[in-house]
A protein has these predicted regions:
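N-terminal pre-domain/capping segments
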Residues: 1-141, 162-177, 184-187
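Glycine-/small-residue-rich active-site loops that bind phosphorylated ligands and cofactors
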Residues: 23, 197-198
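Active-site groove signature of glycoside hydrolases
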Residues: 134-155, 186-195
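Polysaccharide-binding and catalytic clefts of secreted carbohydrate-active enzymes
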Residues: 147, 151-171
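Short helix-to-loop capping/linker segments positioned immediately adjacent to catalytic or ligand/cofactor-binding
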Residues: 179-181, 195-197
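Conserved small/polar residues in nucleotide/adenosyl-binding loops
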Residues: 200-205
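Hydrophobic alpha-helical segments, chiefly the membrane-spanning helices
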Residues: 211-219
């Protein structure tokens, strides 16, 4: 059997990211409601946004195998599997340019708003918790955003000085290395979802491939 045939054998069915459907109205305001809704539509997997506390208690998930077993069991009871945990909002807060502080503050808990340094540290610690929770849940991949320090330079005037992009990616690597180390320790791959404000040209993608991330490959 060829590689294509082998990969087809591992496909279990469609999965869905719950974040886009969260609402104050049932069935989109509870874990049970969303699981039943997804299962009834024929989905086999769900990606769980960790910033929605009614879906998952990330603090407990990072510390308790019992909590994770019960959490996973509930989801499995609907014929669903967890594909990944998601920290898209928290990951974006790892690296926020000051020009966007006000807009991104809405992603953070009230205790960390209007305090960029504390907000960044909270985001980093949250990502580390997600790494541990992923391990307890038996997951080997995690979905997130990297943050974007250079979006304000997309079409600059005057032209950005030489070395600015490299400096931005170097700072991004500095902030992410401790997080990546934690995911490594827990046997979980980090999967960056690339939006236009993160890697906006092929040149920017090439620049990212040159970033020193402790010998890791960015695919």
């Amino acid at each position: 059997m060829g590689e294509h045939g082998k990969s087809m054998k591992t496909i279990k069915g469609p999965a869905i990211f719950l974040a886009q459907f969260v609402d104050k109205q049932a069935p989109f305001n509870s874990l049970d409601g969303m699981c039943k809704w997804a299962a009834d539509l024929g989905y086999k997997g769900i990606q769980i946004p960790t910033w929605e506390s009614f879906l998952i208690d990330l603090d407990k998930a990072a510390e308790s195998q019992t909590y994770c077993d019960e959490f996973k069991g509930k989801i499995n009871s609907y014929g669903l599997e967890i594909t990944e945990l998601s920290t898209h909002l928290q990951g974006q807060l790892v690296a926020v340019h000051p020009a966007y502080d006000l807009m991104f503050d809405s992603f953070a808990p009230d205790a960390y708003k209007k305090n960029p340094k504390a907000r960044t540290q909270w985001a980093i610690e949250t990502l580390k918790k997600a790494a541990k929770a992923s391990k307890w849940l038996g997951l080997n991949a995690h979905a997130t955003f990297s943050g974007a320090l250079l979006w304000h330079t997309w079409h600059p005037w005057p032209q950005r000085p030489d070395g600015l992009v490299e400096m931005g990616f170097k700072e991004l690597a500095k902030r992410w290395l401790p997080i990546l180390n934690t995911f490594d320790e827990n046997g979980v791959d980090v999967c960056y979802e690339i939006h236009p404000c993160l890697l906006y040209t092929s040149d920017a993608a090439d620049d990212l491939l040159c970033v020193d991330l402790g010998g890791r490959r960015i695919i």
